Amino acid sequence: MGGEMGAGTGPTDPGLSQFHGLAKYYDAINDWKDYRRETERLETIARSFGRPGRTAWLDVACGTGRHLEFLRRRHTTVGVDGSREMLRIARRRLPGVPLVLADMHTFRLKRRFDVVSCLFSAIGHLRTKEDVRTTFANFARHLNPGGVAIVEP
């Protein structure tokens, strides 16, 4: 939200514009997903890497905020997404949760996190190996020492 970062543009796939038009249907299309259970698995992974208890959690490519809906119950959360329309839905779902419009490759927040997650194959929208390296470096920049990045291919 205001002042947390300098948004930029990055090398994500121009096909991401498809999500702008689909935003209002996105949750219905993905209704088959069990976000609560997936979130429990994410928390188990984070704990297995020594991140017990309440953590600062950044969800990159957060979409409509379905994982954040469960993560915020036990963690301090922030979401980043490149779609204004997805974030509009997420803001209705997640009042009070900071949500930032930015590209996963170039976002800059003024804080670090214990966990950075990037789920639902969002990383696959990057176009080159260099884009992937740069994006992972960006994730690392936003992690506290000993922090964990959880990326779903």
PLM feature segments, named:
Residues 133-145:
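A short glycine-rich, Lys/Arg-flanked "PGG" loop and its adjoining helix->strand segment in the class I
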